Amino acid sequence: MDASYDGTEVTVVMEEIEEAYCYTSPGPPKKKKKYKIHGEKTKKPRSAYLLYYYDIYLKVQQELPHLPQSEINKKISESWRLLSVAERSYYLEKAKLEKEGLDPNSKLSALTAVVPDIPGFRKILPRSDYIIIPKSSLQEDRSCPQLELCVAQNQMSPKGPPLVSNTAPETVPSHAGMAEQCLAVEALAEEVGALTQSGAVQEIATSEILSQDVLLEDASLEVGESHQPYQTSLVIEETLVNGSPDLPTGSLAVPHPQVGESVSVVTVMRDSSESSSSAPATQFIMLPLPAYSVVENPTSIKLTTTYTRRGHGTCTSPGCSFTYVTRHKPPKCPTCGNFLGGKWIPKEKPAKVKVELASGVSSKGSVVKRNQQPVTTEQNSSKENASKLTLENSEAVSQLLNVAPPREVGEESEWEEVIISDAHVLVKEAPGNCGTAVTKTPVVKSGVQPEVTLGTTDNDSPGADVPTPSEGTSTSSPLPAPKKPTGADLLTPGSRAPELKGRARGKPSLLAAARPMRAILPAPVNVGRGSSMGLPRARQAFSLSDKTPSVRTCGLKPSTLKQLGQPIQQPSGPGEVKLPSGPSNRTSQVKVVEVKPDMFPPYKYSCTVTLDLGLATSRGRGKCKNPSCSYVYTNRHKPRICPSCGVNLAKDRTEKTTKAIEVSSPLPDVLNATEPLSTAQREIQRQSTLQLLRKVLQIPENESELAEVFALIHELNSSRLILSNVSEETVTIEQTSWSNYYESPSTQCLLCSSPLFKGGQNSLAGPQECWLLTASRLQTVTAQVKMCLNPHCLALHSFIDIYTGLFNVGNKLLVSLDLLFAIRNQIKLGEDPRVSINVVLKSVQEQTEKTLTSEELSQLQELLCNGYWAFECLTVRDYNDMICGICGVAPKVEMAQRSEENVLALKSVEFTWPEFLGSNEVNVEDFWATMETEVIEQVAFPASIPITKFDASVIAPFFPPLMRGAVVVNTEKDKNLDVQPVPGSGSALVRLLQEGTCKLDEIGSYSEEKLQHLLRQCGIPFGAEDSKDQLCFSLLALYESVQNGARAIRPPRHFTGGKIYKVCPHQVVCGSKYLVRGESARDHVDLLASSRHWPPVYVVDMATSVALCADLCYPELTNQMWGRNQGCFSSPTEPPVSVSCPELLDQHYTVDMTETEHSIQHPVTKTATRRIVHAGLQPNPGDPSAGHHSLALCPELAPYATILASIVDSKPNGVRQRPIAFDNATHYYLYNRLMDFLTSREIVNRQIHDIVQSCQPGEVVIRDTLYRLGVAQIKTETEEEGEEEEVAAVAE
């Protein structure tokens, strides 16, 4: 096959192949897998999750060597849940193939192969990627210098990409896992020859190198025309290169590191000393070798658990057998150099590797991943640098971007060092200049690994126009997206740089780090014909200077440096880094656009940069990290985003209630702000704005935490005149008062970091006339709105800084916080919210001496009412704070209360009921979240229509979270108000059902004599002439009456049925249920069944009906609680007797929680016995078993009779029983929840205050496991073990 081939000779040494015309990528020697062939025993097929686990386990172990096995499992499990459908389908397909007994690697590779086999090849060739190079075409011209190319791969290295020769910029492999690609010999000869003659770029792409040793020895490779000789020389030593390999000039060596490390992009460039002015510009051969974590790991990786002797440990590096004594654990393994870490030993910083470019003075940058130092290379000192590398560099991975346009011979070479973190990298070529473009395609889904696209622009190619990322796209002329990619994507899933400004870290996410990815090679460049792109206004272009700026200073915050008197070096912008370049005109502009941390969750929390060591602020407070911002927050209510400047303050990204906005388009077009929004866009805007408000607005509940804000409000309300700068000629008068103009200080969207649009009148985001309402001000001001230009976000940004003392209600009303707190205090006293709002407005009018028209007053009332309930929903509040400090989450006695006059008017609300009977379970979290979202939406969009139709079956009761059961039910849809009182004894019927004498499912087969006998036992009258059907109907009517609750009272017309609630003996609310239909025993059963612990004694005036209803609704549960006693102290078939219940007495403090959570046994009484009793003294003649439910039968319950009598005249009961009627359903439910919380929390605060007053020095108030208040006494004397013991004593 020898033939002339432009004088270029390539000799490929193969393993087990004697022909020199084929290049394959076999894997390393390893044990072959056994599948269902030749009768061999097969391995147990693994699940998709297990395949993913094996792929990513080793990487996580190396990235986080200090984590225990359980934490690693949690992280991998979490990342599996976060995988997208496409990412998970890869492992599902592999699992399916493995289950079928096929080799998943070869099968998947065969499925993605696009090039058929060449005729004539032997079928015994390895099933892998190979390149056919005609040997006959390599024997011609050999007058040019040669390039030695050596690509060596470790035995332990995982699967890498194969080499595939592409013939045109557009013929990029479209699949990530191609197994077999070959090019015809004749076509390759013709096309490579054409490329060589035209001076184009020869590309060698990589998709997937199988795990075998690949060695190209003595391979001379030459690109270019024979009359333009030049030599390519650049030596790059990868991390983890031990020793100093002797490599001659003109060779390229890429030794592969250990498993799990990334491999840099290797660019082979020409030698400037051999080039001439006529040499074609920017000709090179690029070998993109993607990170090992990107390709599939070998299946030989096993999860092993090594057991060592007590007090000993082993090295975590696979294959290393080093053991150590735990007490003398070294920081790194002396055998393999693996970092072992320690409690107080930080990981050392990786050594720097320097790269010096042999030619070109254009902009050069290295993208440095997380936990890395910048990597540079010097051509003449590659051997020295290689020998200095240590094994600790296994943690460091670099990406080296080299751009080398031609220049004059002898010009001094320069190198630049740039640190770029969490950034999109965009290298933009200036018009008329020769260079390359590096484009970062933005990752559009939260949690997806960032991609860096390396490419060159070509105006002749279809994809020449490189669009800018969404963060920096100009609003006037958005660039079209390319039809085909023109760059090489280097995916870096497992690494990420620390943020420049010390921003907080997100939660770890692994996200399919081992999934194979595709590498896209750059298109050839045409000299002097670079494409031009306009720089967006959102971020300024970088100035090109000769000096390298200092990206990082020392480890102190800028505010700390300022206090210490040190100079502060501030970057030009939050997402900009200035990259210098030499004096040459042939330069490229580099722009770094910052990516929000939410977009790319990092692997780990630690970083290699020096930690911030800021000076202390006031105790319990923190300051914004932006040195130019003076915003101060309380630690308990620290916002995620600074409301003043928009800087990210959060440290933890785990947010369950809100989801990040997912962008479906890789490069979304910027919204045209001149066109009105469509219906779909308005819905997107609504959701985004609500998410923004919940994320940024977090109002403290305690007024003391806002003392400084109230002082500011008072100062601005006083409107003082201050004389300053008084001189002989001039007098300066300063007036402190409220501003007339309010807008959000943010310039970027606080959700997606896109630029914000600020428009004029009648635009999508223009200024609006707004009321300013304070205790002494009632005036109109201007509120400016800004809108996010990301079409997938469109969030409206208004003035929402509560620490200025104002709360924004839909840019229609700015009300001071002291007025909202005043309304709350009035509601706490039982005042109708609408009355309180009218009192506030009347007071303000009197103070300002302004008279409002009826229309203006009505508008202000509605705005202030909606704003108040949104203010309550945005207040940070823990509803467990209302749990009684004496009873805790498991009171021994609970008493039923009702509020029949606390109702909702039905004139503006229509309740609907499901057409078919479904589950009785209701979702408590969803119901209350819907109520909160509704009022917040009314504030964000005042023109939105409130809820007018309500599904009554989803109304959930309210419990403190720790007192709520696992399943919460509402069976009001099954309640029948038309059921008439039926004669007969329900108690007797329930007893017959429990004994099995009567079975309703067999009632049709009973004879008339048996039916008459059952009716007599139940006391149901019947006639001798009644038919069998009439007898059955009489029996079923009694059953339905008992199950329905017997006493379903119809509420007043056009009103709901009020609410019922249960309280502990200290009048703290334990649970509430809001009724649409009239109250019945069924509602009390729902309330009891939805509680975390069914109380041992439940006091209700309809005790018999509640007990019988519970027997029919939950027969198995009641059989455990009271057997056949039907909730009585003794059997209802026998005369009532006095029963002693010693478990109900006050017992000594105990925290015994040995019983399981869902056990029927009560955690305080330690018994399963429950009773339903009443406190009535008058016997009920219609209820023969009422005497068995009397509270007086138990002497231990005698004190509670006094408590019940005192509740009627108590203050909390008076507040709760105030008659009130609401027109707005959302406000009604939120009001009742707020009232339950405020009245209960006031009682608990008094309990805490009493205990604090009795505390001795050294004692603190705590809550125990059952959430009861107690006093913990901490012994200061050191015990023999050197530990402190806590002895708790209950305070009742």
Curated annotation (Swiss-Prot):
SUPFAM superfamilies: HMG-box (SSF47095). Gene3D superfamilies: High mobility group box domain. It is found in: Nucleus. The keyword Nucleus applies. CDD domains: HMG-box_HMGXB3 (cd21981). Residues 42-110 bind DNA. Its main location: nucleus. Keywords: DNA-binding, Nucleus. It comes from the Eukaryota. One of its GO terms (molecular function) is DNA binding. InterPro entries: HMG_box_dom, HMG_box_dom_sf, HMGXB3, HMGXB3_CxC4. Residues 370-391, 562-572 have a biased composition (Polar residues). Residues 363-391, 448-505, 562-588 are annotated as: Disordered. GO terms for cellular component: nucleus. Residues 467-478 have a biased composition (Low complexity). The keyword Zinc does not apply. This is HMG domain-containing protein 3. It comes from Homo sapiens (Human). The gene is HMGXB3.
